[in-house]
Every structure is written in structure tokens, then in C-alpha cells.
């Protein structure tokens, strides 16, 4: 979005966002992450520059995935949101849905929640025709397999020759007692 706005600090500029309350909550979260970050590149920035914040692409590296999702959802300019979604061969509602699913999945993993046979409360959206087919329409959208398919979809889009399928297969082989059908 920095490229479209010509503003390397767009992420902290309220003019680009639709909901002021959501923007203010986002800024509080950004402040917390920035002020407590121990990342070398953030420490270098603080010691080298006078700006209150680093450029948006640096902030994006330290803020939680859920905050990135809310930033995307709050972008005022729908054309920019559409352009970002099209980078992943998706439309806006599907990208928002999938970002939320990935965030929930990530949070469950980080908090050691059981995920392999869990039924999620969220029902992810699915587009009719995928440019990069991976997810079938008969898959239960509330199970971890669908979340893994979404992650694999993004991996295939960003890093086409990734080894996620191999690693997942190895993981499942390591734990043969897991009922794959429950996923």
C-alpha cells in the first residue's frame, strides 16, 4: 500500500482508514509492539532515525497477524483493497475471510489449543473458481484441513515450490494415532 499511496508511513496515517475507532485501537497495538520490540532492525531504527515510527513495511514485520488483518479490513480505498486481494488471485471478502481463518488458526497453535479435530465457529468463504486450485468445495470449511488448504494456497501463491505438503505429510506420519478424517 505504500506504493499506491506514495506514503511509507501510511499504516499510521488516519486518512487512509475508514473507521477512526478501529484505527485508534490499531495505533495502540502498533505502539505497544513497537515500544517493546527487541528486533535488531527496530532497535537500529530507533537509534538511527528521529521519526516516531519506522516505515510501514518495518511495522508490518512486528505487528500481530490479527492487527494486519484489521488494517486491511479498515483500508478506506476499496480499489486498494481490491488490488491487494488480486495479488493473491482472490476477491476482497474471500481474502478477509481467509486472513481471519489464518489468524485464528495461528492463535490456536500459539496457545497450544487442540486443532486437529476441532470444529471452528467461523465459516470461511470459498470462491467459485480458484486460479490456483487446491481447495475443493466439498471440504468442511470449519475444520483444520480447510485452514491448512488456505495456508497452502497462500504458500503456493507466494512460494510456488514450497515443501509444505511434504512437511505436513511427515508430521502426520510421525503421529499415526491422529484420525485424519477428523481433520
Predicted features by range, described:
Residues 1-183:
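Long, contiguous internal "core" modules enriched in hydrophobic/ aromatic residues
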Amino acid at each position: 500500500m505504500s506504493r499506491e499511496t506514495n506514503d511509507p508511513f501510511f499504516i499510521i496515517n488516519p486518512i487512509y482508514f475508514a473507521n477512526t475507532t478501529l484505527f485508534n485501537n490499531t495505533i495502540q497495538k502498533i505502539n505497544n509492539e513497537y515500544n517493546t520490540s527487541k528486533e535488531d532492525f527496530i532497535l537500529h531504527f530507533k537509534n538511527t532515525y528521529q521519526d516516531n515510527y519506522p516505515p510501514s513495511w518495518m511495522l508490518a514485520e512486528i505487528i500481530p497477524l490479527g492487527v494486519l488483518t484489521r488494517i486491511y479490513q479498515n483500508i478506506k480505498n476499496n480499489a486498494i483493497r481490491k488490488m491487494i486481494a488480486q495479488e493473491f488471485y482472490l476477491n476482497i471478502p474471500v481474502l478477509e475471510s481467509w486472513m481471519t481463518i489464518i489468524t485464528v488458526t495461528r492463535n490456536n497453535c500459539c496457545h497450544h489449543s487442540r486443532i486437529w479435530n476441532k470444529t471452528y465457529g467461523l465459516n470461511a468463504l470459498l470462491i467459485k473458481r480458484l486460479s490456483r486450485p487446491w481447495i475443493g468445495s466439498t471440504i468442511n470449511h470449519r475444520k483444520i484441513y480447510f485452514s491448512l488448504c488456505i495456508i497452502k494456497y497462500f504458500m503456493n501463491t507466494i512460494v510456488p515450490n514450497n515443501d509444505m505438503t511434504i512437511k505436513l505429510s511427515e508430521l502426520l506420519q510421525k503421529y499415526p494415532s491422529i484420525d485424519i478424517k477428523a481433520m
